[in-house]
Amino acid sequence: MDLITTAHPERPELDMSFSGKLLRAVAQGEMPESMRLFRPGRTVAFGRLDRMRPGFDDARRVAIAHGMTPVLRHAGGHAAAYDSDSLIIEVFRRHDQGLRGLESRFIEMADLLQRAFAQAGVSLVLGELPGEYCPGRYSLHLPGGPKVVGIAQRVLTDASLTTAVAVVDGGEALRTVIAAVYEALELPLEVNTVGAVTDQYPEASCELVRQTLIDCGIADGSLQPTARLEA
């Protein structure tokens, strides 16, 4: 896979549309399979299930009031919040498996993240926490602590996009945002499931995790050791 580092932190909606552009390009064979690593802007990413809830408009206003940009994502369930203290990992693959390869791609991403974080001195546990935000079987959490990584997929006929959001720092601020957004959406939430890696590992940083992700990708042969920037 090629490595892509392009990001639009000042315009989160562009990051969302850029991901869709890359997925379509991979599906059409216009570019090779790739991994995109970037630090996003202040974002609340709503799922399509959120849009059908009566409190959706209020939740968007709440996000804006907290200085976040609301966007609608194509993958995942319910709302997630992240900012420049988070790291987004996107893996674009071309294949004809469709939904048949769904679980294996989730496992592949979770395994990569656990290996990379372990190399950075951080232990992550696979599994959904009771009452977590944007719940999922392949969430990763700190031992006895909060969820710090969510994983989602978008699947086309000829390609897939597996996305992970790792909250490295700034857990307290995001906890406030998510609690307010979920209250507006009238969704259940155990607030203590919201946090960041630095809650237990204060020495962790986005740059450290980014580098260990690249190192792990190169070591297992899935990632080319050169960066490719997209306009």
Predicted regions, residues:
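Short, solvent-exposed loop/turn elements at beta->coil junctions and helix N-caps
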Residues: 75-79, 127-131, 154
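Short, conserved charged micro-motifs
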Residues: 54-57, 98-102, 172-177, 205-206
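Generic non-transmembrane alpha-helical segments
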Residues: 25, 58-62, 66, 112-120, ...
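N-terminal lobe of the biotin/lipoate ligase/transferase fold
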Residues: 1-100
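Long, positively charged amphipathic alpha-helical accessory segments at protein N-termini or as interdomain linkers
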Residues: 120-122, 151-154, 158-231
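Beta-rich nucleic-acid/ligand-interaction surfaces
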Residues: 126-147
